[in-house]
């Protein structure tokens, strides 16, 4: 029932004219609504299945996330489901918007990483596999009745995408700016501990250096901790 309410057949986007309502504004709002629903329901192929997966996962784990970002390889916006165990925040965190370090653990095949390296988004480094077992994923596999196969060419590398605040001298021109850490996204290959990329995570014309938010938090029930 939740899926039908959140994603109706004509799309989830609704628009509202704020302020004086005119015919031109209403027509513009309708165009925005139609375009956004077209993007979500037709172009972004992962949107509906990932949202369905999130709704199924939410009561099992109590917490789940959506990650909305621009994919350099696909050259379009992407909205993906992120499991609670794959998004790590400091112990004291109460809300994502106030958290200064968010780590997204991403599983990527070698080919996916090569694509990003070829596109110039990742550095060309030697990747290294890890021997660590994912106990949480193993438990999910047990519930689903599936098991791991030999790694072979299907090995998934652990990529750590960290949304952090840093003081990088080479990226600051004003001496006063060095006193304040500003938002960056640092991506690391967990196996080799080498940096794949560092990108700023704020708009160039923003004097406040406000972080661009990538994640949306869904809680099944409120709780005492961050994850509900």
Model-derived segments and spans:
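Extended alpha-helical, oligomerization-prone segments that build pores/tubes and scaffolds
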Residues: 1-228
């Amino acid at each position: 029932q939740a899926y039908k309410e959140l994603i109706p057949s004509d799309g989830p986007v609704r628009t509202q004219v704020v302020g004086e309502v005119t015919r031109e504004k209403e027509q513009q709002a309708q165009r925005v609504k139609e375009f956004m629903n077209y993007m979500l329901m037709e172009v972004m192929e992962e949107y509906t299945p990932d949202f369905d997966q999130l709704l199924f996962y939410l009561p099992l784990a109590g917490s789940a996330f959506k990650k909305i970002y621009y994919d350099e390889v696909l050259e379009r916006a992407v909205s993906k489901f992120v499991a609670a165990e794959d998004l790590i925040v400091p112990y004291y965190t109460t809300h994502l918007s106030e958290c200064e370090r968010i780590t997204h653990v991403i599983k990527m095949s070698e080919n996916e990483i090569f694509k990003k390296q070829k596109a110039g988004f990742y550095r060309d480094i030697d990747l290294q596999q890890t021997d660590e077992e994912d106990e949480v994923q193993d438990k999910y596999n047990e519930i689903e009745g599936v098991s791991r196969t030999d790694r072979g060419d299907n090995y998934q590398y652990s990529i750590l995408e960290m949304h952090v605040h840093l003081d990088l001298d080479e990226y600051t021109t004003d001496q006063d700016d060095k006193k304040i850490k500003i938002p960056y996204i640092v991506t690391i290959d967990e196996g080799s501990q080498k940096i794949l990329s560092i990108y700023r995570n704020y708009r160039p014309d923003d004097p406040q250096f406000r972080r661009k938010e990538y994640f949306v938090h869904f809680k099944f029930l409120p709780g005492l901790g961050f994850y509900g």
